[in-house]
Amino acid sequence: MSQSRHVPVMLQRCLDMLAPALTEPGAVVVDCTLGLGGHSEALLTQFPEARLVALDRDKEALRLSGERLAPFGDRATLVHAVYDELPDVLDRLGVPRVQGVLFDLGVSSMQLDEADRGFAYAQDAPLDMRMDQTTGISAAEVLNTYPPGEIVRILRAYGEEKQAKRIVSAIVREREKEPFSNSARLVELIRDSLPQAAKRTGGNPAKRTFQALRIEVNGELSVLERAIPAAVKALAVGGRIAVLSYHSLEDRLVKQVFAAGAATTAPPGLPVVPERYQPRLKLLTRGAELPTEEEIAENRRAAPARLRGAQRIREDAE
């Protein structure tokens, strides 16, 4: 995987969004999804007074980005952790509050480009999809062992796949003949089980199923449900958070957490809203910001990206 091909998504916009919080000496910024370190490298370069704490559950990503960030010495602390472990990580490092948090959700370029990880549907590979290959169950195990109703639920909930029942009927029929192990067989099965009209819309017909399996294998949405509120809680007043998501389920979750923080919690009808009911957050984006057409032309993986940001303006009510 050549690092030159790794283009961080909406990089300048993320830096601009976090910038007002990161100019003070000693500011701490957390990259919750280190990946190959593109965003982290830019943060350390643009904000020379800042310290970085970076998390990733993928040991190979930590190794590669560790080489990339080595020139920054002890300004960068890399941690093998899932991003909902952020409170524990900050606790261990003795960092009570941070000034910036960045999430770039979804699969890193490296995971997509390394065939044997099984994330990509465009090439044949073992059906693994674990971001941390030292733990958990693989996509093949989900396909081979989950009850049919559970796989239907996963494809509908996480892949928004309208043809889930058709696909799962085919999966169950095929797994009885021989367990699934490789992605090409699954891609072919999906293609064969979809009606013509469904194949004409929205890119590769396997895309939604692969997304759903990846989310299930890595527990992505449940992790995110814990991680975004934890990240907001870790922000000092004036601190900022930027989140890049890549499908509507993630984006909706981020939107809900930010909207709740930016709303007053006062009972209706109060003439003056007491401090404890005032919003904790200020939204930095109107809706979700999208990548420019120029960026999508340069980096097609940016196409589905949605960026939301918020700033902490008050402490939580006691």
From Swiss-Prot:
Biological process annotations from GO: rRNA base methylation
Record field: transmembrane: none
Catalytic activity: cytidine(1402) in 16S rRNA + S-adenosyl-L-methionine = N(4)-methylcytidine(1402) in 16S rRNA + S-adenosyl-L-homocysteine + H(+)
Entry keyword set: Cytoplasm, Methyltransferase, rRNA processing, S-adenosyl-L-methionine, Transferase
Region feature (Disordered): 293-318
Pfam families: Methyltransf_5
Chief site of localization: cytoplasm
Annotated InterPro entries: RsmH (IPR002903), SAM-dep_MeTrfase_MraW_recog (IPR023397), SAM-dependent_MTases_sf (IPR029063)
MF term (GO), any: rRNA (cytosine-N4-)-methyltransferase activity
Keyword Glycosyltransferase in annotation: no
Any one annotated GO CC term: cytoplasm
Subcellular location, record wording: Cytoplasm
Annotated function: Specifically methylates the N4 position of cytidine in position 1402 (C1402) of 16S rRNA.
Database matches in HAMAP family: 16SrRNA_methyltr_H
Name of this chain's protein: Ribosomal RNA small subunit methyltransferase H
Lineage: Bacteria, Bacillati, Actinomycetota, Actinomycetes, Kitasatosporales
Gene: rsmH
